Amino acid sequence: MSEPTSRRPAYARLLDRAVRILAVRDHSEQELRRKLSAPVMGKNGPEEIDATADDYERVIAWCHEHHYLDDERFVMRFIASRSRKGYGPARIYQELNQKGISRESTEKAMRECEIDWSEMAHEQAVRKYGEPLPSNFSEKVKVQRFLLYRGYLMDDIQQIWRNFAD
């Protein structure tokens, strides 16, 4: 029979928790650190793991060493996922920044992903407003506002009317 979780060493409990978290989806290192340091719900309510900073560092190092944690892979998958959901580069940059990913890593991954953002913006506009896209000023402003909210750059938005004019 396994020993109760309260008697297991903090490192083993942290490692078990990290693997369970990373089994669900990829996380950035900062996200994993935040989740590991948060209290976990036990049978008697929230439980803290009495772990040292060294325990956290060892767990993070183990996850990197065994390829459970890889910020580069996380960034590529995140960009692919968010672009499939119709979000533009500005929004993706901002979300990755919130997840602790450096701007340089994000820019490198964005260059490698080969996504045509103006085509994506056009697809999102057509999905929301239909074909043909509005041509009067007030309706164009609505489309622009929608696409800016979704994270597309103004250059990509303006390309819609230049490249896809009927």
Curated annotation (Swiss-Prot):
InterPro entries: RecX_HTH_1st (IPR053926), RecX_HTH_2nd (IPR053924), RecX_HTH_3rd (IPR053925), Regulatory_RecX (IPR003783), WH-like_DNA-bd_sf (IPR036388). GO terms for cellular component: cytoplasm. Keywords: Cytoplasm. Its main location: cytoplasm. It comes from the Bacteria. Gene3D superfamilies: Winged helix-like DNA-binding domain superfamily/Winged helix DNA-binding domain. It is found in: Cytoplasm. GO terms for biological process: regulation of DNA repair. Modulates RecA activity. Belongs to the RecX family. HAMAP family: RecX (MF_01114). This is Regulatory protein RecX. The lineage of its organism: Bacteria, Pseudomonadati, Pseudomonadota, Gammaproteobacteria, Enterobacterales. The gene is recX.
